[in-house]
Amino acid sequence: MAIEREASGRCFESPAAGRWGAITMDKIAVLTSGGDAPGMNAAIRAVVRTAGFYQLDVIGVMRGFHGLIHNEFIELNPRSVADVIHRGGTILKSARSAEFPTPEGQAQSVANLREAGVRGLVIIGGDGSFRGGMRLQSAGISIIGVPATIDNDIPCTDYSIGFDTTVNTVVEAINKIRDTATSHERIYVVEVMGRHSGHIALYAGLAGGAETVLVPEVEADLDELCRRIVSGYKLGKAHSIVVVAEGVGGDFKTGRHLDESSAFQIGDY
């Protein structure tokens, strides 16, 4: 996107940007949506400071799309974000909105932004947040999406905001669990976030030295897993750590009987 500055100091998108043409704006908004991710506050700070460089005013939208509908706007400036870079969570809060997916909710959101003089919105969040942004973009609001999700499941993004911290936190937990697993010669299963994405399990499992990693993207065979664990113990292995993404478990290929709760009975403990 080609960015230039008018004589008045306001930032605008030059005609070189393509089919959108020249867009003049002097105020933008920023919101965080979805689950909070470590680094969101640093991203908010970066947006505010960069906007200040281009002499743009910044409005913070509290509680994501819920706040967009209910006009929960606050003014942001470099001073208001001076001490947030190392804080977890998000200073703009985050909340679910049952109203935004409706045409009425989206129309109200656009109306509130236009009434506030906002032409551009920066959305810091994950895939669901970006889908919401696409709806606003189709209504004429310029959108920039900043990938911020611990699942790291945004296409064409190497590392989303929050993913690295999450992996390091899981590795730290695995390192602590391993000592107990070795002492008692037991199997420990570590479940991590990732309903449809196995990035956390894969990276943390590799970095933490887990014996087995199960991810939603790869079909797992529970019987084969058990055979590998038993084989390891016969060879003298003192413990086994299995890292499992939360989305794994619905399609196990197994001949074992499942009880009424659908819980897998790996063996007597």
Q: Where are the regions a protein language model picked out?
A:
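N-terminal phosphate-binding or glycine-rich loops at protein starts, especially the Walker A/P-loop
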Residues: M25-I69
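Glycine-rich oxoanion-binding loops at beta->alpha junctions
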Residues: L68-I123, G128-S129, I161-A173
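Short glycine-rich or small-residue beta-strand-to-loop segments that form or flank ligand, phosphate
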Residues: K27-G34, T90-A95, R119-I123, Y188-E191, ...
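Accessory alpha-helical/coil subdomains and C-terminal extensions
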Residues: N112, I123-G125, R131, R135, ...
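Short, ordered loop/turn segments at secondary-structure junctions
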Residues: S33-D36, L56, V61-G67, R96-S97, ...
